[in-house]
Amino acid sequence: MKVKSAVLQEMGRPTPYAKSKPIVIEELELAPPHDEEVLVKLLYAGLCHSDLSVINASRPRPTPMALGHEAVGRIQQVGKNVDNVQVGDIVSCVFVPSCGTCDSCRTGRPATCTTGSKANGAGLLLCGQSHLSRQVSKPTDPKVIHHLLGVAAFSTYSVMNKNSVVKIDPSIPPKYAAVFGCAVITGVGAVVNTAKIEFGASVAIVGLGGVGFCALLGALAAGASSIIVVDLEQSKLDLAKKLGASHAVLSTKDTSLDNLIQSIKQLTRQGRGVDYAFEMAGSGPTLKIAYGITRPGGTTVTAGLPHPETQFSISQVTITAEERTLKGSYLGSCVPTRDIPRYVQLYKEDQ
């Protein structure tokens, strides 16, 4: 069938993109779903920083590639071995397709699925193929179009593995439902799955993008006693305060990180730091801040996606002598079929 997609022609073109035009809307040919796959009509898609990370070459991927991964859609067709959704269902799209058989999947960590991660890196579906192609005028032009993260959501229609979709309550407005498969599960999941914060814990969130705000909502829902938010933009801090943050700290590019860390710690009990600090921006400096404001015995979680060459260094003795924990969180350490319905229910309860 014919579809229209936003196709990245080449990574790393110079900004402004309005001038270099790395993305072109193209008419493509979409092959029908295989036995384990579904055809989805995309309703809404979010623009996530992970899309930009591919465009600017921070996350190298093969091109040309149909972009988009944070979306909601309606099932139009199912393969004969699909039993988790049916035609007409509204679904949230998930950007790590899980195979269900590798060690990660069998131990309840589908976000780190070996097969799914390999397919994503190659720009293919879990079956090892692309379903998108285009007509070419020259034999040297690439015909195959790759799929971003098994979703390719910036399209009118897309084929995905059955494990890339989760049925959701159709009463949720699709413009909000679109973010549940990425920003929501990544931010909320970092708090409730990766860190597993306790009721009454003190929390800090460094970086207020979409994922950072979802972490804030997760900390509020989990019953954090105090929440410190840190960002470069005052408007984001103001919104975070309205949502329930206890303290808002404005950083600037000229701020000394050591001074900033000390000023944030002064907002905590006895100036020792917070129980849990979440790094949500994906940079070395923000992780240094998050680690620096974590109390002895506390936990630092990083869920931001940095450039592959970004380095972070700490004094090793602080891990040992202060019994610190430093954890990574990808896709909110979630099990999508379990967590997305839970978070949808929290949304319906105004949490």
Segments the model singles out, each with a brief description of its role:
Residues 212-213:
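N-terminal Rossmann-fold NAD(P) dinucleotide-binding loop
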Residues 29-45, 55-106, 111, 119, ...:
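Glycine-rich beta-strand-centered segment in the early N-terminal region that forms part
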Residues 303-304:
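Acidic carboxylate diad motif detector
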Residues 298-299, 324:
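Glycine-centered, small-residue-biased loops immediately flanking beta-strands
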Residues 101-202, 206, 351:
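NAD(P)H dinucleotide-binding glycine-rich loop of Rossmann-like/cofactor-binding domains
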Residues 294-295:
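Helix-to-beta-strand junctions that scaffold the AdoMet/dcAdoMet cofactor pocket
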Residues 2, 257-266, 270-271, 308-351:
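C-terminal substrate-binding/catalytic core of Rossmann-like NAD(P)-dependent dehydrogenases/reductases
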Residues 205-208, 220-287:
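Adenosine-nucleotide cofactor-binding segment
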